[in-house]
């Protein structure tokens, strides 16, 4: 009986954990961290809810947790500062994500990320452990100044120090069929790479207006939605001319696939201009399609990967074109992506959403012979 009581108390503590957490609004950070707040405000971290992200909204509109259970089961990572996060994570509870709740629409708030004390690694998905000390934030600047608003801790936090504080949400996510729906498969030791070094590079501007500094870590979180130009240095495009054809090489020098979400579709577009006339060659498509019973399916239904031609971590992909290059030809190459595979647009009713239908140019190269 005593062991049973202790077990129940332990469960109560675990599930009540989020109720012990309340987070300062991100707007509070703006007064001192003006540049960082402006970057954050336009990022996906500030706009991850169904009401603010049309693509996520379209997927959520089809989700059984929305239509049958009225519970925002994505809250653990999309609205982690929600005042009813416990209910969002608890089977049988009703906990929708609503527009008029500021703790929902603040998304992945400044205070939430900077209170991640440690990360528990799990097979299904990882879990962020949040410090119970409000207004004590983890950072990396050793010569930080005392803030009148909050305390700052710069030691004793492994994940903040090694730049992989993101893996609580961005490492992997398995569904009920044991399918890894979305995964970075990150190798933390790879050439010293980490999440922050690529997605939060150093940019000009001070961390705060209380002490002038030359640079800070970018808080717009470069990715497939925004600021992808910051990532072009990590992918190289080269061309090899042969006698009767040519090869384009795409060298992905990152520690994860070129695109991670199964909705995405990368495309290599190639045009050859000769004597003022441009010939468009066939697009090369890179995708990862998940599905069930042989057909593409939503992430909660999918049980297998049906197709995977996505460029993988540290892969140099070669694409051959049966086109003979002549002297004076110019070859224009564009590598980019659709945030939603065009084949899924109609099913998700996203025909009128520019963010879903437009082609995002990532990197361009031109070669003249």
Show where each model-derived region lies.
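Short, conserved sequence motifs used for protein processing/export or organelle targeting and
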Residues: 190-192, 197, 201-369
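Sequence context of c-type cytochrome heme-c attachment sites
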Residues: 16-161, 165-189
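Sec-dependent N-terminal signal peptides
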Residues: 3-14
């Amino acid at each position: 009986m005593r062991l049973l009581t202790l077990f129940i108390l332990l469960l109560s503590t675990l599930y009540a954990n989020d109720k012990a957490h309340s987070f300062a609004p991100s707007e509070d950070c703006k007064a001192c961290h003006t540049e960082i707040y402006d970057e954050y405000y336009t990022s996906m971290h500030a706009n991850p809810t169904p009401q603010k992200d049309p693509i996520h909204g379209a997927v959520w509109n089809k989700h059984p947790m929305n239509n049958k259970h009225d519970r925002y089961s994505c809250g653990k990572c999309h609205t982690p500062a929600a005042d009813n996060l416990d209910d969002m994570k608890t089977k049988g509870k009703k906990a929708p994500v609503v527009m008029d709740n500021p703790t929902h629409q603040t998304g992945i708030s400044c205070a939430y990320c900077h209170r991640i004390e440690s990360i528990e690694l799990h097979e299904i998905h990882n879990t962020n452990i949040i410090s119970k000390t409000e207004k004590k934030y983890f950072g990396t600047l050793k010569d930080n100044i005392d803030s009148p608003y909050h305390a700052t801790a710069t030691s004793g936090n492994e994940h903040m120090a090694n730049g992989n504080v993101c893996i609580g949400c961005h490492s992997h996510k398995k569904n009920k069929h044991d399918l890894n729906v979305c995964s970075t498969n990150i190798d933390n030791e790879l050439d010293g790479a980490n999440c922050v070094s690529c997605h939060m590079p150093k940019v000009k501007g001070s961390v705060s207006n209380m002490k002038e500094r030359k640079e800070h870590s970018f808080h717009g979180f470069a990715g497939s939605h925004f600021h992808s130009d910051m990532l072009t240095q990590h992918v190289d495009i080269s061309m090899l001319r042969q006698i009767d054809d040519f090869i384009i090489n795409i060298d992905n020098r990152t520690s994860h696939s070129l695109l991670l979400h199964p909705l995405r579709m990368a495309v290599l577009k190639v045009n050859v201009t000769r004597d003022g006339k441009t010939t468009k060659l066939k697009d090369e498509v890179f995708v990862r399609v998940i599905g069930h019973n042989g057909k593409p399916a939503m992430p909660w239904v999918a049980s297998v990967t049906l197709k995977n031609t996505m460029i993988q971590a540290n892969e140099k992909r070669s694409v051959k074109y049966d086109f003979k290059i002549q002297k004076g030809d110019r070859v224009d190459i564009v590598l980019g992506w659709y945030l939603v595979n065009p084949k899924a647009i109609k099913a998700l009713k996203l025909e009128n959403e520019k963010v879903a239908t437009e082609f995002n140019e990532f990197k361009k190269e031109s070669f003249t012979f």
